[in-house]
């Protein structure tokens, strides 16, 4: 994967026929402003599709007539005419592309979505649409990484009975008596038994001052977008 920094966004290039981007400062939109007019780097032919995100594990198959702002946190589509959009302020954006079936997907995966296994549910959706998992390319976009994402002992205790010790050891780090969580590591280890092509941007929303971070700024948000070319 090649990460390219543009004026208003990062681009994650894994193939010539798909576009994956993550916006950065000073680009800033409110939800009610989501439209092609305000995403001037998205082709006018693409219909913007997005959800009312509530940290769920709900995923929608998107057709051209999909109604925006339904409650959920994942989108999948085989349409050439749509751009899938999700908004972030520290949570993990996960992009999907089947280079054979030409299917795109996008997940907003906060810790709640991750712990509810939304990424596995997206894989099931791809298989249901005819994808072979070996043809999938998955990209973890910018998120609040374990260098910065401090959590409480109660947070760790609440998930300790739900997942294996190996998975937790791969996802949590202790430094100087403090506990830190890495959302991408959690999801990466969930997928360890699958034959998948996975790429990690390794960009931290808290560290990088050109990205919006709720924990650092308490305001604003970035957007992840994916569309076929």
From Swiss-Prot:
Disulfide bonds: none annotated. GO terms for molecular function: adenosine deaminase activity; copper ion binding; oxidoreductase activity; S-methyl-5-thioadenosine phosphorylase activity. Its cofactor is Cu(2+); Zn(2+). Pfam families: Cu-oxidase_4 (PF02578). It catalyses: adenosine + phosphate = alpha-D-ribose 1-phosphate + adenine; S-methyl-5'-thioadenosine + phosphate = 5-(methylsulfanyl)-alpha-D-ribose 1-phosphate + adenine; inosine + phosphate = alpha-D-ribose 1-phosphate + hypoxanthine; adenosine + H2O + H(+) = inosine + NH4(+). SUPFAM superfamilies: CNF1/YfiH-like putative cysteine hydrolases. Keywords: Copper, Hydrolase, Metal-binding, Oxidoreductase, Transferase, Zinc. Its EC number is 2.4.2.1, 3.5.4.4, 2.4.2.28. Zn(2+) binds at residues 55, 91, 108. Homodimer. Purine nucleoside enzyme that catalyzes the phosphorolysis of adenosine and inosine nucleosides, yielding D-ribose 1-phosphate and the respective free bases, adenine and hypoxanthine. Also catalyzes the phosphorolysis of S-methyl-5'-thioadenosine into adenine and S-methyl-5-thio-alpha-D-ribose 1-phosphate. Also has adenosine deaminase activity. Belongs to the purine nucleoside phosphorylase YfiH/LACC1 family. NCBIfam families: peptidoglycan editing factor PgeF (TIGR00726). PANTHER family: PURINE NUCLEOSIDE PHOSPHORYLASE LACC1, UNCHARACTERIZED PROTEIN YFIH. This is Purine nucleoside phosphorylase BB_0467. It comes from Borreliella burgdorferi (strain ATCC 35210 / DSM 4680 / CIP 102532 / B31).
């Amino acid at each position: 994967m090649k990460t390219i920094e543009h004026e208003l966004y990062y681009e994650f290039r894994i193939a010539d026929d798909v576009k994956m981007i993550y916006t950065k400062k000073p680009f800033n939109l409110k939800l009610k402003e989501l439209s092609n007019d305000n995403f001037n780097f998205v082709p006018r032919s693409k219909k913007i599709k997005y959800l009312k995100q509530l940290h769920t594990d709900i995923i929608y198959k998107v057709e051209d007539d999909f109604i925006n702002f339904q409650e959920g946190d994942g989108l999948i589509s085989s349409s050439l005419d749509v751009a899938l959009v999700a908004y972030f302020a520290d949570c993990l954006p996960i992009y999907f592309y089947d280079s054979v079936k030409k299917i795109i997907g996008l997940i907003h995966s906060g810790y709640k979505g991750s712990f509810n296994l939304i990424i596995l549910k997206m894989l099931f959706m791809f298989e249901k649409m005819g994808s072979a998992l070996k043809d999938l390319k998955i990209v973890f976009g910018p998120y609040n990484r374990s260098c910065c994402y401090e959590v409480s002992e109660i947070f760790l205790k609440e998930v300790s009975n739900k997942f294996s010790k190996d998975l937790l050891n791969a996802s949590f780090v202790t430094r100087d008596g403090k506990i830190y969580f890495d959302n991408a590591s959690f999801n990466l280890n969930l997928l360890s038994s699958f034959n998948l092509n996975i790429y990690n941007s390794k960009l931290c929303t808290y560290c990088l001052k050109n990205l919006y971070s709720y924990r650092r700024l308490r305001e604003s948000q970035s957007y992840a977008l994916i569309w076929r070319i």
